[in-house]
Amino acid sequence: MKPSMKVRLFVLSLAAAGLVAAALPIQAQTTKQAGPAIHSFKVTRTGHGRPMILIPGLVSSGDVWSATVEHFKDRYECHVLTLAGFAGQPAIPAPFLQTVRDDVLRYIAENKLDHPVLVGHSLGGFLVYWIAATAPDKVGPIVSVEGVPYAGALMNPGATPESSRAFAEQMKTMYAQLTQEQLGEQTRAILPSMITDPKNAEAAAAWSRTSDPATAGEAMAELMTIDLRETAAAIRTPVLLVGAAGRLQDDVTRKQVTAAYEAQVAKIPRHQVVMAEHARHFVMLDDPAFLFAAMDRFLGEASGSKPETKQ
């Protein structure tokens, strides 16, 4: 069965909003499992120092953070997640995002991680907002790369979880009917809009072919029907949102997109938005120097940062 045109169009619209992700080839590095696997994700731990949790995006392996870990491992103990149903990991029952959120908080508690830095890409960026808003006294600074509190509003400024629900359910049903090969074909078709290097884009498609289509559909449906823009006001640590402007054609469009990103995090008391002018959705791959410089500056300013006491 060939994927329907509606599914293809929806995937393309998600790509425009920065929500379809895949992993890429990585360099070998020394890692170790961080204890027994949590059922909604696998963890590898590398480095030493302050804890940093890195969460990849949709149909991505945690290996997407390889260069980021290499950059930070001499100062941070990097806990890199690969989420259930993605990149060969076993799937879990719905709800997907809430389960991952709760398991990350449990992982922080069980491993006695002291206010870890949270870093997320795309779907992972959404998750770091939710984790921090749910337990604002348990986490440190937050970096979201191309992840926003409510993706639906990027595609349609008037969208709400309720107005998106019917289409989300339809999309979830259609994804459940796809094979892994079909999911891989769809991802491969859109990756050139998300990763500059064609070789990386081609390699990335292979990761989606080891992901569970039903999990991908469930995750996207949940992203369409959970709006964290008000909830995120509970976050009490500094937040850096890194957007990608590499495919934006003119200054007017750049200003509009930047304003849309600013609006997404407007309720977060301490936030910054920076745009990577030469990167597409995978900023950590297209322009790692920009991302690392932005993170170094942000984390330096937030050094030792713990949640502010709510007045």
Where do the PLM segments sit?
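Bacterial N-terminal signal peptides
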Residues: 11-22
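Active-site loop/oxyanion-hole signature of alpha/beta-hydrolase fold enzymes
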Residues: 36, 79-119, 123, 133
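Conserved HGGG/HGGXW glycine-rich cap/lid loop of the alpha/beta-hydrolase fold
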Residues: 45-90
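Conserved hydrolase catalytic core segment
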Residues: 114-156
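Flexible "cap/lid" loop of the alpha/beta hydrolase fold
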Residues: 142-177
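Conserved alpha/beta-hydrolase catalytic His-Asp/Glu region
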Residues: 154, 158-159, 174-231
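Conserved loop-alpha-helix segment in the C-terminal half of the alpha/beta-hydrolase fold
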Residues: 236-279
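Catalytic active-site module of serine/aspartate enzymes centered on a nucleophile-bearing elbow/loop
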Residues: 268-311
